[in-house]
Amino acid sequence: MNRKNLFSYVIVSTFGAILLEAYAQWLGKLWIYPYLNTFIYFLVFVLGFALYWLMIVETYIAAKVLLDHIYKGRHYVTKPYKFERILYYVLASVGIALIMFGTVSLISDYQNYGGYSFSINEITDYKVNFLYILSTFIGVVFVLELFEYTQHKTSFIKDLLHEYPIPFYSILIAFSVTALIMETENIPHHFWIYINWPYENIKFLGLPVSMFLAWPLHYLGFLSLFRAFTKEDSQEIWRGDLIK
């Protein structure tokens, strides 16, 4: 990776980190960092998430390369279906509506609660509606689908439409391994603590099952973001279609 590509990656990874933390941590209060104060948190923010997203990309690519090898051959498509010319614009419109719904609902709820206070290390007794956060993340993915389509790039939904499910299976494999390793390693140390998750009484390894179910969004969200705003470095992410 040359300097230009590295700079692009850092910009995209930082933007992805801001999206994730803004909705899931700063507003969503889904986890806290008990050992960090605000200064240290922002000091390590860019580097920490650059490494985190790199792990997301590399584990996904590793799973995808393995599955592409097992299921010999790739599925190439020379042109999109006719309905795709409209589909991605519809998805983007729905995505914008979902982002607005989630954001406005979060702000409105905080106003009704009595206001918002920024904290990364304190447990709050206010529980955010998880639907608002989920809506926002799905909305972002839908909007990114249009970005990828207008640049004649492959995308997650396009791969599924053209019967290339390897990216979907790769995300499932990669997130299962990564989540299990990261979460079990964190259990005795509590570098981050999960709070305010839906159905948090249903647990696996002492952690909310709903948290594990949300893990694929880390992959889908950042991989889509990375592909939408970079070129050569992200070509392998959804590659399976050859779009002209």
Each predicted region: which residue ranges?
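Aromatic-rich, lipid-facing transmembrane alpha helices and their immediate juxtamembrane interface loops
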Residues: 1-244
